[in-house]
Every structure is written in structure tokens, then in C-alpha cells.
Regions:
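Non-catalytic cap/lid and distal C-terminal segments of serine-dependent acyl enzymes
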Residues: 1-116
């Protein structure tokens, strides 16, 4: 699998953001199924590579794994904070699908995470 450390600008957050992406070495379909893997409060997106075997678990499944960094946002739009729910639910999938061959089909998208 390929591990990409990706930096991009978020219009909804108004700042540079990061996500780590695992991709299969070979495309087996025109658009990959995707696991959106969300970190917990005390960590960031890198925790999945540092403390789990996510690459080993997903190798051979023919799917992408997207691990975004959302800081301590609780993945919500805060009254006095940034619109992280909009970022995660709307903007990030569009950005990731434009950068990588990811399937937009509901049955090809999976969400998992820790804490928060």
C-alpha cells in the first residue's frame, strides 16, 4: 500500500489541513471503496499508523483509508469555533474524491473511529 501525507486548503475552515491516506498499489476497480478513519480527542490523524496495524489490516482489501486531522473539534460545528462537521461531512469527501479515485456510493463508504 502507498501512504500519502496530504496537505490541502479547506475553504470551510479557512486554513491548511492535513490527512494521511492509504491507497492500494494497484487499482482493482474504477473507484475505490473508502474507510474514513477518525481519531480521538487526545491524538491526531497519525495515531492510526503509530499505534495500530491499519496498513496490514487493510492491505489486500482494495480500499482507500482516509485519516483526517481535526484537532480537538469533536467533529462538530461550534458556536465559537470552526465548522468541522461541515468540513468532515461535505468538504473533505469532495476534496478526497477529487484527489484520489474514491467511490461516492454510499455502500462503498465506511466510517470508524476512536473516542470523540
Amino acid at each position: 500500500m502507498a501512504l500519502l501525507h496530504t496537505h490541502f486548503f479547506s475553504e470551510s475552515l479557512g486554513m491548511q489541513c492535513t490527512m494521511d491516506v492509504l491507497l492500494p498499489q494497484k487499482l482493482t476497480r474504477p473507484a475505490l471503496p473508502v474507510l474514513w478513519l477518525l481519531h480521538g480527542l487526545s491524538d491526531d490523524h497519525s495515531i492510526w499508523q503509530r499505534r495500530t496495524s491499519i496498513e496490514r489490516y487493510t492491505d489486500g482489501l482494495g480500499m482507500a483509508v482516509i485519516m483526517p486531522n481535526v484537532h480537538r473539534s469533536f467533529y462538530t460545528d461550534m458556536h465559537q469555533g470552526l465548522p468541522y462537521e461541515r468540513f468532515i461531512a461535505d468538504e473533505l469527501p469532495d476534496i478526497a474524491r477529487n484527489l484520489f479515485h474514491l467511490s461516492p456510493a454510499r455502500e462503498d463508504n465506511f466510517v470508524a473511529g476512536l473516542s470523540m
